[in-house]
């Protein structure tokens, strides 16, 4: 890739901004025809004061046009860019949590069941793929966006709860500073640069070296990876085709381990250490 060439991500950002700008100008014109006193959108100056905007950077311009569309063209914004409300299921309770629990080191919790004199320990563990080394992230010919799937991360046994997902991306080489992005897209969204840059969810900028991106749910634990991602998909955009991306995927699970307490039918005494 030539250093003088406009990176695809920069080009896509400008195209997306111009699409929003044209929409704001069009709506402003329509509203002024209905109401001459309507204050329309202006890219270069504050229409209320007439003074030029102090900050004309791309990020500032995007923020201004986004705010205007949210306030004056809400239906368009909601249809094109707004995120859907994230379901907030009730906080899940592990078996035995009705009794008093005691916090232990390294996040372990022990639940005591008085009826059966058993304890349930919740043990945290990680699984990863690939296990020994990272693997190259492969793209289709003439494409620079790829969806990352996590169906190869499996729990040790059915019923284990999922806490989080960790995606490691090692970026090697490249002619430009802007290496790429990691973004979350809706399930039905096309895996393209335009959809990735227009995603209403936070996008993570990638830098040279090792990047670690964590994905967690609104709740403490969930039953599966699709539940954690809320049926959405994770995509990686490579901005510079002269760089190489290597990935490894991790998943953190919780597992319940039962144990019978050493309680007999004979005399029982307790010594309290102070």
UniProtKB/Swiss-Prot annotation:
Keyword line: Capsid protein, Virion
Transmembrane region(s): none
This protein's record includes keyword Flavoprotein: no
Region Disordered, residue ranges: 88-113
Location of this chain's protein in the cell: Virion
InterPro entries: RBDV_coat
Keyword RNA-binding recorded: no
GO cellular component: viral capsid
Residue spans of biased composition, Basic and acidic residues class: 102-113
Highest taxon above the source species: Viruses
Role description: Capsid protein self-assembles to form a capsid about 33 nm in diameter. The capsid encapsulates two genomic RNAs as well as a third, subgenomic RNA (RNA3) (Potential).
Name recorded for this polypeptide: Capsid protein
């Amino acid at each position: 890739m030539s250093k003088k060439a406009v990176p695809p991500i920069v080009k896509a950002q400008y195209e997306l901004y111009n699409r929003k700008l044209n929409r704001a100008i069009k709506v402003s014109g329509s509203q002024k025809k209905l109401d001459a006193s309507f204050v329309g959108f202006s890219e270069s100056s504050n229409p209320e004061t007439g003074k030029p905007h102090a900050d004309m950077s791309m990020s500032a311009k995007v923020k201004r046009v986004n705010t205007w569309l949210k306030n004056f063209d809400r239906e368009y914004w909601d249809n094109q860019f707004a995120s859907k409300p994230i379901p907030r299921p009730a906080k899940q309770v592990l078996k035995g949590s009705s009794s008093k629990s005691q916090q232990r080191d390294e996040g372990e919790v022990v639940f005591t069941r008085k009826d059966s004199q058993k304890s349930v320990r919740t043990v945290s563990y990680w699984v990863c793929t690939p296990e020994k080394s990272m693997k190259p992230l492969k793209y289709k010919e003439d494409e620079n966006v790829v969806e990352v799937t996590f169906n190869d991360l499996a729990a040790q046994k059915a019923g284990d709860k999922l806490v989080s997902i960790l995606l490691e991306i090692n970026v090697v080489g490249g002619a430009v500073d802007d290496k790429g992005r990691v973004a979350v897209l809706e399930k039905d969204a096309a895996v393209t640069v335009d959809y990735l840059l227009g995603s209403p969810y936070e996008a993570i900028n990638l830098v040279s070296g090792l990047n670690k991106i964590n994905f967690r749910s609104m709740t403490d634990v969930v039953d599966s990876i699709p539940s954690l991602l809320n049926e959405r998909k994770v995509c990686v955009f490579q901005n510079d085709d002269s760089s190489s991306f290597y990935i490894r995927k991790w998943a953190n699970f919780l597992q319940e381990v039962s144990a019978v307490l050493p309680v007999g039918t004979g005399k029982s005494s307790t010594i309290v250490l102070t």
